[in-house]
C-alpha cells in the first residue's frame, strides 16, 4: 500500500492575502423639493413713476415622471500585506450600471427656460482603484521613510437614452461614448500659406483667409486630393473629457524629532475647458473693444502663433471656431501640501507646566505645480473648477460637471504655523 504525501511550504513574505467579491444596489434621490411640480419666479418692472408691477414667469418646468436613479455595482478586490508589514495595499475592480440617470436637460432659448431635471438614460462605469503603502526605512539609524501611492481609472459609457435616439447633440450625449464629452470642431492649427491644404482654402473655408483657425476636415477628397465640400457641422468631433488615470503620491520622512510630509496629486490625459479662452472669453476677442493681455496672435511674421489674427472671420463677437481655443490637456502633477514638524522630547520644563507632549509645525498648501501643459501656457491652476461637480446645464454647451477653469477665485497658497499641546 502506497500513499502520496503533500507538504505546503509557508510563504514567509506574505502576511495577509484576502480576496473580496461584493454586489450592491443603491438609489439616488438627489432631487430638490417640488421639482416634479415646477416653479414660478417673480420679476419686477417699472412702467413709469406709478407703474411699478411684479410679474411671474416659469423658472422651472414640471416633470411628473421624475423618478429615482438606481445603480448596481459589482466589486472584485484584493487586500495584501507583505514583508512583515513593510508593504501593504488594495486593488479593486468595479463594474457599475446605472438606470434612470438623473441629469439636467438643456432646452432651446426659445422655450423660455434654460433646463429641467429628467431621467435621461443608462450608463456603465468600469474601472479600478489601487493603493500601495510602504515603509522604506523603519527607524534605521534614526531615519524613518514611508511612502503611499493611490491610482484610479474609470471608463464611462452612455448605453441608452430614454428618448430611444442615439444622440442628443444639444446636451452632448452620444450612446457608446462617455457622458462627459464635448461635441465641437477639432482645432489643428492656423491657416498658413505653406500649408498643403492652403490651395483648397476657398473650398474648405469660403471667404476664409490666412491666419484664421484651421479645424479638422472629415469629408471626402477626389483622386487628386481635392476636398469635395466645405467644412461644416458634420465635421464636429466627439471629444472625451475623461482622464486616462489619476491619483496621488505622498511621502513622510522622519529623523529623530523632525518629520517632513509631502502630498501630491496627479492626472494624466483628458480635457479641461477654460472659459477665459472659450467662446465669449477675454483672450480671443481681439477686435480692439476690450483691454487685452499680451496675446500671441497670428501675423505674417508670427505664423506659429496660437491665436488667429485680429479682424478675421467672426462668429458673433468671437473668431470663427473660437470655442476650440478653450480646450486644454488637463494633465498635471502638483504638490498640494508640505508640512515640516518637530516633536519636542519630554523635558523637565514641560513636565512642570503639565504638558505631556509638544509639537510645532509649519505647513504650506498649494506650494507649486510640478508639471502641467495648461499651467505652463496660462499660469493658472488646472485643478480649479469654476462650476464644481454640479449636474446643472449652463450656456455655451459647458456642463457644470465638466472640469472648468474660469474667472472665479484661483486657488491660493496658504502658509500655516501651528503648535499642538497635550496636557
Regions picked out by a protein language model, each given a short descriptive name:
Residues 2-9:
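Short, small-residue-biased leader/transition segments that mark boundaries at the very start
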Residues 15-21, 76, 87-89, 145-147, ...:
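Transmembrane beta-strands of outer-membrane beta-barrel proteins
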Residues 267-359, 363-365, 386:
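Extracytoplasmic gating/loop element in the C-terminal half of outer-membrane beta-barrel translocons
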Residues 118, 124, 137-241, 281, ...:
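Conserved small-residue
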Residues 46-88, 116-140, 176-184, 240-245, ...:
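Outer-membrane beta-barrel signature, preferentially recognizing the C-terminal barrel domain
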Residues 23-29, 93-99, 134-136, 151-157, ...:
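Transmembrane beta-strands of outer-membrane beta-barrel pores
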Residues 120-127, 171-196, 297-303, 320, ...:
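C-terminal beta-signal and terminal closure region of outer-membrane beta-barrel proteins
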Residues 10-69, 88-123, 162, 166-168, ...:
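Solvent-exposed loop/turn elements at secondary-structure boundaries
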